[in-house]
Amino acid sequence: MISNPKYGWCNFELGDFKGSPSYLTDVPVDLLVAFIDQHAKGRGVAWFDEEGTEFTLVLTPYSMFIIEEKESPVLHDFSEINIKDLEKELIEDLEKDLNGWSEFITDDDREEILQHSNEIRQKIVMLKEMI
């Protein structure tokens, strides 16, 4: 789902959709919160800035969409994808490169990186408990 957190950019793939979110949004935390909210509130949203374009992941109990904002809005329907499988994939992607994701939106401040790492870990634990 997400990979390659380098130089303030990463890769996002869902079905046939590909995006390149930037450091302007906290990609790992925003995704974790969207999935946690979907369990807790019945809906979750994560918005991503690609610096010139943007896209939004929308989760409901029965559907999953990406709204792509380029020249004109495009709606991608991923309702056939199993959300639990996607949650497991997200957790695996984050745990595979926790150091890279911890540094994604931070400067070289070691304390800030540690805090971000702890936040990601805590949210992973929360999501695992909900799956």
Protein language model regions, located:
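Long protein-protein interaction modules used by eukaryotic assembly/scaffold proteins
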Residues: 56-131
